[in-house]
Amino acid sequence: MSLITDIYAREVLDSRGNPTVEVEVYTEDGGFGRGIVPSGASTGEHEAVELRDGDKNRFSGKGVEKAVANVNGPISKEIVGFEVTDQIAIDKAMIKLDGTPNKGKLGANAILGVSLAVARAAADELQVPLYNYIGGSNAHVLPTPMMNVINGGAHSENKVDFQEFMIMPVGAPSVKEAIRMGSETFHALKSLLSADGKATSVGDEGGFAPDFANNEEPLQYLIKAIEKAGYKPGKDVAIAVDVAASELWNDEDKKYKLRWSTGEEFTTEEFVKYLEGLVNKYPIISIEDPIDENNWDDWASITKELGKKVQLVGDDFFVTNTEYLAKGIKMGAANAILIKVNQIGTLTETMESIEMAKEAGYTAIVSHRSGETEDTTIADLVVATNAGQIKTGSMSRTDRIAKYNQLMRIEDQLEGVAEYKGINSFYNLSADAREEISNK
């Protein structure tokens, strides 16, 4: 193989118009790779540090020239000369160079940009698709999408406490058909909202954020939209929600407050019962962050209570970190992890988290961030790891659609071996639970 000869970073913009880091890697034999780093709006307390400039006179302090300088300076000096295929060694060298537990010195956005660009350069050098380079010849599972079609909580200005309401085409025979079903349901939902005089403008992730009266009204609209599109709720299209419970938790009172809707307050036990009531009433197959990210014992309790019949996803709870995931597995807390490459900061560490989850029987959902770009790496990553589920936004906005289009390309390339598991991608749930969802 050939050596890395040049690494170059620049400041570009993400889907929200905020600065982010783009990195290009070049090899001596003409290999080229480019990676663009996403960013989140709501971030976990323990995420790797996204280095921003802090200069209020430039991009309101959100510039990333410091991170860019770190790539073009110390990181480039360290990594130029490495074999481009030495991904693990390159990632570990950058982690060592940074020397902090949260990548706060060089910036996770600087390190990740290089990590992603190196992988693409290696794939280009070998003349193979990125998913094939990362996952080898066994990469063949196309993911069941989580499509965020209604936004609430911190992602909106309506009276809805939950952050995201998603549809999952669990009954589709292929990812191409899953995307079609999602698109048809999305447009049916838009038609219903418009007919009722509700706003149909879209948010950061392409979902609608009209004014609703409470947390159940969006669920009711989703049921109507699924049916209007010609599908059966549960059997064909299931529902997933992101509660983002840390946004609702009051650490002083030790209660969850529905701060955007009714103002009701719940003890942890009452809140779990509240969520269980929704699971029993609607075809909800997945709940993300149902408990505050720092309440480990409560996470174990809700998993014991609901973990056999609904996917319980740790996002802010695990932040794609193997240390937190290992603790969760030991405690029996959650049964799934959301995988965000910029939460941990390198491709190697991301892969380690996915592998650890799968070995423990946890599902791994590869995810976008609210501040996305045209980079489609996560589409290749989810196939490379056979993770089985992806969360990459709604059926609008090019930054989201780019990932769906890439999945359809990959499915075409894997003709004859591609597998779409749908409801069976929820291997963390009992067979009875999967059957029950289909019959709701």
Curated annotation (Swiss-Prot):
Cofactor binding note: Binds a second Mg(2+) ion via substrate during catalysis.
Binding site for Mg(2+): D242, E288, D315
Highest taxon, organism lineage: Bacteria
Binding site for (2R)-2-phosphoglycerate: Q163, K340, R369, S370, K391
EC number: 4.2.1.11
Broad enzyme group: lyase
Keyword Magnesium annotated: yes
Cofactor(s) essential for the protein: Mg(2+)
A GO molecular function held by the record: phosphopyruvate hydratase activity
Main location (coarse class): cytoplasm
PROSITE patterns: ENOLASE
Active site: residue positions: E205, K340
Keywords carried by this UniProt record: Cytoplasm, Glycolysis, Lyase, Magnesium, Metal-binding, Secreted
Catalysed reactions, semicolon-separated: (2R)-2-phosphoglycerate = phosphoenolpyruvate + H2O
CC per GO annotation: cell surface; extracellular region; phosphopyruvate hydratase complex
Pathway assignment: Carbohydrate degradation; glycolysis; pyruvate from D-glyceraldehyde 3-phosphate: step 4/5
Subcellular location: Cytoplasm; Secreted; Cell surface
Family: Belongs to the enolase family.
Stated role: Catalyzes the reversible conversion of 2-phosphoglycerate (2-PG) into phosphoenolpyruvate (PEP). It is essential for the degradation of carbohydrates via glycolysis.
Name by which UniProt lists this protein: Enolase
